[in-house]
């Protein structure tokens, strides 16, 4: 079970949002590269970066901070990035800088042809982020709810050749209210590619519950507010996951 610390970038700083609201952000660090190093030192095997300004602007906005993170830890662990990635040139630029995975969210839903092209050009490097509320997919930094069912889109994108899917329950993100295990497992069981859980991770019980369903296809979990607030000790949680799932 991969526990993947999230580093959300806003104006070059590491922040956390509550339910995706840019106006409800807390700055946790003004040095994202040092933050990345600290998670690696605590045993992280992958990092999850989000360019928040980019997600809302539709183009990269925190590239300098991202490249500093990649220079600091990119040669040691896999790094994945989402937010504002809407064209092949941006993907190529980030992969050349040492990024392992690019996460495509809104653009995958609105422009499936772009996702197909990305999977063809950069096979093995493309992850889709599906954000949903009550089983329906949301786009545009969670501001728009679509009529698409998560499982239907998951199957479609799997056929395109995406590496894995990050499933975020946006009703729970940043609320420390517990992962929506049931919905995550439902998606994982419907697919043959791995699913990464996200949104609401709060404590060690969540980690243990996720380890119980790893064999259903749940590969990992994005760790956000809980590891920054101290509700979850990251190093202890990763050690527990390794103990449970070897």
Curated annotation (Swiss-Prot):
Catalytic activity, reaction form: 1-(5-phospho-beta-D-ribosyl)-5-[(5-phospho-beta-D-ribosylamino)methylideneamino]imidazole-4-carboxamide = 5-[(5-phospho-1-deoxy-D-ribulos-1-ylimino)methylamino]-1-(5-phospho-beta-D-ribosyl)imidazole-4-carboxamide
One cellular component (GO) term of this entry: cytoplasm
EC number: 5.3.1.16
Pathway: Amino-acid biosynthesis; L-histidine biosynthesis; L-histidine from 5-phospho-alpha-D-ribose 1-diphosphate: step 4/9
TM ranges: none
SUPFAM superfamilies in UniProt: Ribulose-phoshate binding barrel
Active site per database record: 8 (proton acceptor), 131 (proton donor)
One GO molecular-function entry: 1-(5-phosphoribosyl)-5-[(5-phosphoribosylamino)methylideneamino]imidazole-4-carboxamide isomerase activity
UniProt superkingdom: Bacteria
First-tier enzyme category under EC: isomerase
Subcellular location: Cytoplasm
Protein keywords: Amino-acid biosynthesis, Cytoplasm, Histidine biosynthesis, Isomerase
Family the UniProt entry places it in: Belongs to the HisA/HisF family.
Protein name: 1-(5-phosphoribosyl)-5-[(5-phosphoribosylamino)methylideneamino] imidazole-4-carboxamide isomerase
Organism placement in taxonomy: Bacteria, Pseudomonadati, Pseudomonadota, Betaproteobacteria, Burkholderiales
């Amino acid at each position: 079970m991969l526990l993947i610390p999230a580093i959300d970038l806003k104006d070059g700083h590491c922040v956390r949002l509550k339910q995706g609201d840019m106006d409800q952000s807390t700055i946790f660090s003004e040095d994202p590269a040092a933050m990345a190093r600290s998670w690696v030192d605590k045993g992280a095997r992958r990092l999850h970066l989000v360019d928040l300004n980019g997600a809302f602007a539709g183009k990269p906005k925190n590239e300098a901070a991202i490249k500093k993170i990649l220079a600091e830890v990119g040669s040691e662990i896999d790094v994945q990035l989402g937010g504002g990635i809407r064209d092949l040139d941006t993907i190529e630029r980030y992969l050349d800088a040492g990024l392992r995975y690019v996460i495509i969210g809104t653009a995958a839903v609105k422009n499936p042809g772009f996702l197909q092209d990305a999977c063809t050009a950069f096979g093995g490097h493309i992850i889709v982020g599906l954000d949903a509320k009550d089983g329906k997919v949301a786009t545009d930094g969670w501001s728009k709810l679509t009529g698409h069912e998560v499982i239907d889109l998951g199957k479609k994108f799997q056929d395109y050749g995406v590496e894995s899917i990050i499933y975020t329950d946006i009703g729970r993100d940043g609320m420390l209210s517990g992962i929506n295990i049931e919905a995550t497992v439902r998606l994982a069981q419907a697919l043959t590619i791995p699913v990464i859980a996200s949104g609401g991770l709060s404590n060690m019980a969540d980690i243990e519950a996720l380890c119980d369903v790893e064999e259903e296809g749940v590969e990992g979990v994005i760790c956000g507010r809980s590891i920054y607030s101290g509700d979850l000790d990251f190093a202890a949680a990763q050690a527990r996951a390794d103990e449970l799932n070897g």
